[in-house]
Amino acid sequence: MSSLGQIVSAVEDYRKLVAAKVRTARSDQRVGQELLARWREVKERIGTTVTPTGLRLPRLALPEMDDPGEIARFLLEEGLPGEFPFLTSAYAEQYLEPAAPPPNDEATNQSDPISEEPTRLFAGLGLAEDTNERFHYLSRNQRNKRLSTAFDGPTLYGTGSAADGVLGKIGEGGVSIDTIEDMERLYAGFDLDQPNVSVSMTISGPAPILLAMYIGAAKRRFGPDVMPKLRGTIQADVLKEIQAQNELIFPIDASLRFLADMVDFCSKKMPRWYPISISGYHIAEAGATPVQQGAYTLSNGFSYVEYFRSRGMDVNVFGPRLSFFLDCGLDIEYLALARVCRKIWAIGMRDVFGADRRAQLFKLHTQTSGRSLIAADWRNNLTRTAVEIVLACMNATNSCHSNSADEPFTTPSEEYARYAAHAQSIVLEESGLFKHMMNTLSGSPGMKIVGNAVEDAILEEFRNIDEQGGVVGAVERRYQRSQIQASSHILERQIYGGIRPLIGLNRYADPDESWPEVPMIRTPREKKQRQRERLDDFERRHAGESERCLDRLSEVVESDENVFEELVKTIEHCSLGQITERLCDVVGKFRPMV
């Protein structure tokens, strides 16, 4: 039995434990009285908030119960916010505003956003200075600067901008990064050493090289002791690359080794950095159902835990630095998907891997569904994204990226990127859905029914993967890819057969609709040429040191030393393309699955 089989057993055992505790609470008078006393104490500790209209509400919504068995069931199945099994949320007061004075107090007229707003907006276009300008635009009114970075195709594949055949791809769909100097330009003007600034990088294949460049750029600006202060996330999810994207560069064994070295380094030296974001988003966008997204994301996560432990790494050291990334679409499963993932992760980490509380937390970034956005009657995408934001917040996501309505046509324009950001602000700051009270819908019959069905389906998918020999065995048999492809095919048939409504496309379509005049955002040829010239200049200036650094990197890869620790030195004199080429010479190249 692989760890997935053990996790299925652990979740089933937890269900049995809950049932046993419920029976005991009802049959043992002493236990029942203790639970009733605890319930009263919990409710007495809850503070109150006052809405702008003067309504006084508890800051935490709890059901009215006087049956010890139901109290036991609620505490063990739902849990209080921030308490095992974290079904409600990972933290106690996630979106709540500070406790407010009465509405006639002058302080209520002061506009102050929630203390840790979850808004993250994805940006990446052209050269480093172009994306830097977009970052400053998107964050100009934000107290917390959350810089989420998209990279262009050559960067994602670790290819230098001077390589043959890539000129037309430079800066398209993301930012072009070749050297540590590009990285300095990318985040210029942001205080990377401050707690209100964090950086996210959506890149997996060459992730260790890019993170090394980021560390190097931060050291140049803020000094050699800056690493413990850096906040952010890098994706680095090599398993989902095989299952859904094919942007892997190195063979799977080497990729896992490089990843483990980076996670080990960051866990010990960068306590505010997440060196991996275990990602279901791309799995969902490739065509997976919500259940498949949850099952493959969780199973990949547990596989990483197994692998890191096999390398002698301590789960209580690296566990708190694992993060997750899920898609949120419009299917009803999204009412509870992230909640269920949080619960399964906590049980698996605690009961199978012996992790402590910090390592049990499923820390989640959510992005609204890109696949749900369509070109037909495209302004409806504003509504689709708004609904998805509400669903994401109902699942207590820790951060959120909302897509721009014009994405079916082009890289997000400034106008619609602003609307996407404001949609989150309207949901969390303007509306009262989440800022006054935690747990508004947790425990509701509908949410419980959906959650239980999703949990059962995820465990069944775990059993299927376990029968394939675990995640790696299933990957080798193309199991996940084939399931994703089949689900994608079914979805398309449902859409074009009219079974699945898409407003403006197969229902209530406007026959007179004309396509909008949306300017295509492209990187001018002169900028692409400038990027090549910068790369040539960097490699020429460092020609004396680069070969020596690459030779030393090769030695480290062939030994048992930490590769990432050496990369932090290598990037000072070598470009992304040079490093990738040398690593491929040593470990080989990944052969994409077709």
Language-model segments: what does each one mean?
Residues 191-193, 226-229, 237, 251, ...:
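Poly-acidic low-complexity segments
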Residues 126-130, 142, 178-181, 205-213, ...:
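Conserved active-site and cofactor/substrate-binding residues in soluble primary-metabolism enzymes
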Residues 167, 174-176, 390, 438, ...:
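Residue-level marker of motif borders
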Residues 23-334, 352, 356-365, 393, ...:
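Catalytic alpha/beta active-site cores
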Residues 197-203, 288-289, 372-377, 408-411, ...:
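A short glycine/serine-rich beta->alpha loop
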